[in-house]
Amino acid sequence: YICACNVHTTVTAHENLDYQAVQNNSFMTLPDGKPLSSVGVRRGYSEMGRVTGPDFMEQVIAATEKSDARHYFYGTTQKNLNALLEYLKANYPQLSIVGCEPSLFRPLTIQEETELCDRINESKADFVWVALGAPRQEKFCAKLSKNTKAVWIAVGGAFNVISGVIPRAPQWMQDHSLEWLYRWSKEPKRLFKRYVE
């Protein structure tokens, strides 16, 4: 599984050793935040740049559109998934989408987890994109990816950003580490607890 780590998830991992283990045991953890990539550069990783969930997802999708790679999408609401599918079909018409399921917005039972993994295995998915929000999505990927052959990728709000449901921050805000403020202004109820704590 692959995680995208930002300041919020870094602080959460520092405070919660179980979640820290989830982040540390991932196949790859992307620096999804300018502060993290800046620290990496200062620590000697001169080419470390910011890699956001939406950017990474769209790059992988673009690179695999005309290949045999199969994609499965899990998370967000049905309405937002429909918007994502509409966008992907319009912009990547040859992309192989083999499954798409909304979040149930509650923990899955063991039976539901097993059935989800069975559906993913039956679909022969190569990539499982998960949008449940941190830290839930990373824990979800760490737990369930063991039961499939697919690469699970936790991408948070990427479904909603890529589809245009939630607009991306202007480039100048991204360049000045202010994307969090823009996102907070667009989703104050959802993000209040994250940014105030």
Kindly give the residue locations of the regions a language model identified.
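Proline-aspartate-enriched helix->loop->beta-strand connector
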Residues: 120, 124-134, 150
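A transmembrane-helix-recognition feature enriched in membrane-embedded lipid enzymes
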Residues: 35-42, 169, 173-197
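N-terminal nucleotide/polyanion-binding subdomain common to many enzyme families
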Residues: 1-55
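Short, flexible loop segments at boundaries between secondary-structure elements
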Residues: 102-108, 150-186
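A short helix->loop->beta-strand "cap" motif at the edges of active sites that frequently abuts
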Residues: 69, 148-150
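Short Gly/Thr/Asp-enriched flexible loops that form oxyanion-binding sites at enzyme active sites
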Residues: 85, 138-147
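Conserved beta-alpha
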Residues: 37-123
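Short gly/pro/ser/thr-enriched loop/turn and capping motifs at secondary-structure boundaries
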Residues: 36-38, 136, 158-163
